[in-house]
Amino acid sequence: MSRTFKLGVLAAAVMAAAPAVQAYEAGDLVLRAGAATVDPDASSSNVNLVGTGELDGWKVDVDSDTQLGLTGTYMLTDQVAVGILAATPFKHDINGAGSALSGAGKLAETKHLPPTITVQYFPMPNGSKFQPYVGAGFNYTNFFQEETTQTLTDAVGAASTDIKLDDSFGLAAEIGADYMLTENVGINAAVWWIDIDTEATIGAYDAGGSRVATAKVDVDIDPWVYMVGVSYKF
């Protein structure tokens, strides 16, 4: 028996004895962590000064932020799962936009949490290391710790201002993929589009603390969310 043949037989035996990377099957729980970026595709109405009407060219925009993203998938069957997206709080600057405010800079800021639940479909057989998936579901966004800047306060000629953003319910869609490096550890990349719409209410106050004006603006934030990270299957 030649040495080459012996090595070939040995290699085949080792490969046969090595455990196959089993991807996902019913009952599996997959947790992922990584960098998640919320990148708003924002647009707004004109600011509406209550009792007066719209202020033409007074609009706002929302910038992006990156935080620790956490996702989970529970396999209901070998190909259908429930997924959840969570993260540490995102912080966004709210900037002036439109013909009247485009150069104003930062007017306010807010933090938000965007928990999102989706039903996911994994089309590949569970023996495949590469597991792409798509999903659709719902998002709830909670806004908190909203603050205005002196720039906004000076722009409206008030002694002080505040802002409050309504929470949002909306649809969500996702596409992503896991690649299994071992039986349990993999890498992941995913993208979501989330429907986030809110109404911001701005209050202006005089030196005595009395409210002298109220303004409202509708903002469609509608972000793309990008995440790259690692996964672990339990």
Q: In which residue ranges do the predicted regions lie?
A:
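Cleavable N-terminal export/targeting peptides
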Residues: 1-27
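Predominantly the C-terminal beta-signal and adjacent terminal strand-loop region
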Residues: 91, 95, 182-234
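Extracellular loop and loop/strand-boundary signature of outer-membrane beta-barrel proteins
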Residues: 54-58, 100-108, 156-163, 212-218
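Outer-membrane beta-barrel translocator domains and adjoining extracellular loop/strand segments
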Residues: 43-51, 93-103, 144-157, 200-207
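A contiguous pocket-lining binding segment that forms or flanks enzyme active sites
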Residues: 152, 156-176
